[in-house]
A protein has these predicted regions:
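Conserved binding/recognition cores within well-folded domains
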Residues: 1-83, 87-89
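Short, charged, intrinsically disordered terminal tails
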Residues: 100-105
């Protein structure tokens, strides 16, 4: 996937992506760096859905292969801890689908 960082375009292996966030732009996070994409979040979702990515909220997509643990949070949300220790909150709108995708009751 082509992403921008420091004025350069980088071709990044999607396996390295931890999560993607849309806050005033679309940002892609890896363990080593943050990149920017010209694509909107829904476009990233369409590209990555078949590669193990999951829509966690209106603002974020996470790589299910990088999930270390899950914890129930208030209002039926789920707090996901990634392999690097960062935490992403899965909104209740997407929480049931996350449980289904991971085979959790």
């Amino acid at each position: 996937i082509a992403l921008k960082r420091d004025g350069e375009t980088h071709l990044l292996d999607t396996e390295k992506i931890l999560y993607i966030e849309a806050v005033g732009g679309t940002f892609v996070y890896t363990e080593d760096a943050t990149y920017e994409s010209d694509l909107r979040l829904y476009e990233m979702e369409q590209k990555l859905l078949e590669q193990g990515f999951f829509r966690a909220s209106k603002q974020s997509i996470l790589n299910l292969k990088k999930v270390k643990s899950l914890k129930a949070d208030i209002n039926r949300k789920i707090r996901v801890t990634l392999v690097n220790g960062e935490q992403i909150l899965v909104s209740r709108m997407y929480a049931d689908e996350l449980r289904r995708r991971l085979g959790i009751q």
